[in-house]
UniProtKB/Swiss-Prot annotation:
It is a multi-pass membrane protein. Coiled coil: none annotated. The gene is atpB. Keywords: ATP synthesis, Cell membrane, CF(0), Hydrogen ion transport, Ion transport, Membrane, Transmembrane, Transmembrane helix, Transport. This is ATP synthase subunit a. Belongs to the ATPase A chain family. It comes from Wolbachia pipientis wMel. NCBIfam families: ATP_synt_6_or_A (TIGR01131), PRK05815.2-4 (NF004482).
Length: 241
């Protein structure tokens, strides 16, 4: 794997299952680490809120901090109207965060490095926001395609541009997340492979450098979950404001 840094993103079958309606539904390493990420996410939340103490322990404090953090993102971008959509946005944030952090572990698989996963997640958000927009604002929601004060002769061009920009939102969301996760993991793998091949891994400087890179990748994992969430809230603001 050190010689091929992209091998870590390869999907392979763990348990082969019969095809369903012509589609391969075998249990893969991607399926396994998605399941692990979801289980860890659920355990984190369940054990964090289990006691509900007035004076929280470390785990409860962590859950409350994450929850308050997501609340602040929603309020800053959508106002109080966006708070009713906490379940979706919080779930999106904690799921992406869990998948990203699991992907940092050695010999794991980064689920969010595959566009098919991030695009599916982006489409769920996109469809949800579109439904909310028409439900909350009805036909008024279409005004996002034509800013106020636009000259009538320019309106057709602006509408086409705005419509295209709206439709590519899930594409940009998915590619941004996947590309950043691929880039970060590839850089770490290339540098780590070089250090191992040079037989200098256990000398202080390279070892500390690898630790620093892993720490940076953890930061990127958290940052990408934050960026995906804040963009979701920005798009949601068009639907509720």
């Amino acid at each position: 794997m050190a010689l091929n840094p992209l091998e870590q993103f390869k999907v392979y079958t763990i348990i082969e299952l019969p095809r369903l309606f012509g589609y391969d539904v075998s249990f893969t390493n991607s399926s396994f680490f998605t399941m692990i990420s979801v289980i860890l996410m659920i355990l984190f939340l369940l054990f964090g809120i289990k006691k509900g103490s007035v004076i929280p322990g470390y785990l409860q404090a962590a859950v409350e901090y994450v929850y308050d953090f997501v609340i602040s993102i929603i309020e800053n971008n959508t106002g109080s109207k966006g708070l009713q959509h906490i379940p979706l946005i919080f779930t999106v944030f904690i799921f992406i965060l869990s998948c990203n952090l699991v992907g940092v572990l050695p010999y794991s698989f980064t689920v969010t490095s595959h566009v098919i996963v991030t695009f599916a997640l982006s489409m769920v958000v996109f469809i949800y926001i579109t439904i909310v927009g028409f439900k909350e604002r009805e036909v008024e929601f279409l005004r996002i395609l034509l800013p106020k004060g636009t000259p009538s002769w320019l309106a057709p061009i602006i509408i086409i541009i705005k419509l295209f920009a709206y439709l590519v939102r899930p594409v940009s969301l998915s590619i941004r997340l996947a590309a950043n996760m691929i880039a970060g993991h590839t850089i770490i793998k290339v540098i780590a492979g070089f250090i191992v091949n040079m037989n200098i891994f256990f000398t202080p400087a390279p070892f500390l450098f690898i630790i620093a890179l892993i720490g940076f990748e953890v930061f990127v994992a958290i940052l990408q979950a934050y960026i995906f969430t804040i963009l979701t809230c920005v798009y949601l603001s068009d639907a509720v404001k």
